[in-house]
Amino acid sequence: MPNMKTLGEFIVEKQNDFPHASGDLSSLLGSIKLAAKIVNREINKAGLVDITGAIGSENVQGEEQQKLDLYANDKFKAAMEARDQVCGVASEEEDEAVTFNKDLNRNAKYVILMDPLDGSSNIDVNVSVGTIFSIYRRVSPIGTTPTQDDFLQPGNQQVAAGYVIYGSSTMLVYTTGNGIHGFTYDPSLGVFCLSHENMQIPEDGQIYSINEGNYIRFPQGVKKYIKFCQEDVPADNRPYTSRYIGSLVSDFHRNLLKGGIYMYPSTAMYPNGKLRLLYECNPMAFLMEQAGGVASDGKNRILDITPTELHQRVPFFVGSTNMVKQVESFIEEYPEQH
C-alpha cells in the first residue's frame, strides 16, 4: 500500500513552504474539515431520520430552505466560531453577515463566505450535494468588529477556497493559490486522504452542462453556443455530451476531472443570473483558475468583479479554457438578450 498522506499532514507540509506562515489558515482549514465530517455523517443517514425536505421557510434569495441546509449552516458556523481564526461568516442561508464578538474572534484575521449545502433539494433523490467556501483576510482593523467591507471583496483577494462533495465518496478539494488538491474521506479511519494532487482541467472538453429546459429564456449568444455544441462535426469531436446534475459542486467536479464547461447564464426570469457571486462563483472561479481553466460572466473575469451586496448574482461560465472562450465569442457576436 503506498504511503497515505492525510489532509492535516498535507496542510502542515504546505505551510512549511512559507517561512512566515503563522498556522492560522491551516487551523481554519482544519475547522472546515471537522464540520464537513459532521455534515457528511448526517447526509449519509438523511433518509433514515426526519432531516430531509423543506421546513416551510425561505432564505434571503426567496428559495425554499431545506432542513439540511440549516443544519449544515449551523455546524459550519459553530466550527468557525469555536476557533480564533475567524471574525465573521457570511452564508447564503443568512440575510446578513454574522460577526463573532468574543474577544478571541475580534482578534482574528479572516472572514469566511459559504454555501453550506449546495444542491440540497437533491438529497431526497440521493443525488450528490456539496459545501462551497471562500476565505479572505479582513480589511477592518484587527480587534474591532468586522464590517461589510470585509465581506465585499473581489474574488482576486481570496486567500483560500474549496468545496466538499458528498457523493459516492466524500471529497474535499481546496486551493490556497498554489494549485488545487483533492482529498477523499476514508470513513474507516475518519480522515481525508490525498487522492488528487495538483489537479488540472483539460484545455478542451467535450461536456457542456446547462439546464436546457430554460433554453427559450437564454440570451441569443448562449443559444448559438448550445447549437454549436450539438453540431455533428466529428473532426472537432462534436457533438459534445450534455451532462447536467443540477448541483453546482457535482457538475463542476465532473468537468474539472474530465474537461467541460458549466453555464448558468442570465435568463428572462433572472436577468443578472441566478448563482451568487460571493458564495458560489468566486470560490469556484479561484479553484478553476488554479486548475488551468477560466471563469467568466460571459464578458468579464469573475475574480475581477467588485461586489456591491452580499447576495449579488451574476451569470456564470466556468471550465476548460477553450470552451469558455468559445461561448464568450458567441455572446459578443450575438449581444441580443432574449
Curated annotation (Swiss-Prot):
Main location: cytoplasm
Binding site for Mg(2+) 2: D115, D118, E280
Pfam families tied to this protein: FBPase (PF00316), FBPase_C (PF18913)
Protein name: Fructose-1,6-bisphosphatase class 1
Key words, A-Z: Carbohydrate metabolism, Cytoplasm, Hydrolase, Magnesium, Metal-binding
Subunit (UniProt): Homotetramer.
The reaction(s) this protein catalyses: beta-D-fructose 1,6-bisphosphate + H2O = beta-D-fructose 6-phosphate + phosphate
Swiss-Prot/TrEMBL cofactor(s): Mg(2+)
Binding annotation for Mg(2+) 1: E92, D115, L117
Name of the encoding gene: fbp
CC cofactor note: Binds 2 magnesium ions per subunit.
Residue numbers binding substrate: D118, G119, S120, S121, N211, Y244, K274
Single GO term (MF): magnesium ion binding
Gene Ontology cellular component terms for the protein in this record: cytosol
EC number(s) recorded for this UniProt protein: 3.1.3.11
Recorded family membership: Belongs to the FBPase class 1 family.
Example GO BP: gluconeogenesis
Subcellular location field: Cytoplasm
Record pathway: Carbohydrate biosynthesis; gluconeogenesis
